[in-house]
Amino acid sequence: SFMEPTSDWLSNLKIRASYGTTGNDMDLSKDPIDKVDAFSYLQKYKLGEKYIFGNNLANTIVAGATPNYALTWATSTTYNGGLDFGFFNNRLSGTFDAFYRKEVDILGPRTVTLPSTYGQALAPENYAERSWRGGELALTWMDKAANGEITYSAYLHLGFARDRWDVLDEDATYREGGNLHALSKQGKAEGILTGLIADHLLTDPAEVEALKAKGFKQFGRDPYLGGILYKDTRGDGYSEGPDGRIDSNDEYNLLSENGTPRINYGFGGSIKWKGI
């Protein structure tokens, strides 16, 4: 009854909300077959190197990875809200959805330095966190013309989604102050794009000869006319700054944080005459 004043233009309105949480046995390797190592919460032993004692070749037994007594599931929690609506006797209708998903306690290795005398590897721990967020809008217009003999419609879909690593252990090279800190996944999406940065095509013979005269090499080869000249961005050990050559160190540049499309859209329509 409270919607009666709007009934001449508002035909439908529905608000939706949902919440759910579930366990997930995937780890940072994201391997669908080799997930959590069996019995990694127990101390295991394995055969080690063989040694000669007197005239006999003897096997040895060594301890496996330090067990993780607190091993548990990763937990995925999803929040979703939506709105269904219709206007003008449902000639214009649509839906809007937004979601947020958080996954915590993802199993993965920690990047810690152990003394060589420790003698064991560390078992992976449930520590990493990752989140997803996004939304989708769908609109449809449907009407009739020519005294109802023609039925036509048009639609538009627009979606956005983004993921982010919230907690993730990385090598010191990727941490604050490291040479590859710009490529850290922390706070970024999975699947960032990295690679060489093209500067320009070598179309001037004089420029090519000048580069050769300086001893400039690209992966051990002389630059050549018509080839791509890449930017010299890093030196040995990924150090920032040019070193007079292009090699594998120069491949570590952040090209884009969007390894997968973040925005998807589509539109279209249809028309019928006398139901055909």
List PLM regions with ranges.
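Outer-membrane beta-barrel transmembrane strand signature
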Residues: 54-87, 91-93, 184-275
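Extracellular/periplasmic, surface-exposed regions of secreted and cell-surface proteins
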Residues: 1-190
